[in-house]
Amino acid sequence: MMDINIQDSFYHTVLHKAIYRKLYDIAEFLLEKGASTELKDLDGYTPLQLVIHEGYTEMVKFNNMEQIIEIKTNRISTR
């Protein structure tokens, strides 16, 4: 079985690449399969930070009101 969170030489995961290419269905599929939202790329972006940085706000969904997103000086965490 392949590691869904494998990173390339730029530390991009498949989820990072799906976001860069605006492949929203694939990104959603990867999240459903357990892709990590915590891994950072070479620039220090997690997938969620990348979504915000690139302005892909259509990808942001609030499925759970208990999740609070904090944006602090290039740091995003969920609790």
Curated annotation (Swiss-Prot):
PROSITE patterns: ANK_REP_REGION, ANK_REPEAT
UniProt keyword terms in alphabetical order: ANK repeat, Repeat
One Pfam family linked to the record: Ank_2
Top-rank lineage group of the source organism: Bacteria
ANK repeat residues: 10-39, 43-77
Name the UniProt record assigns to this protein: Putative ankyrin repeat protein RC0860
Species for this entry: Rickettsia conorii (strain ATCC VR-613 / Malish 7)
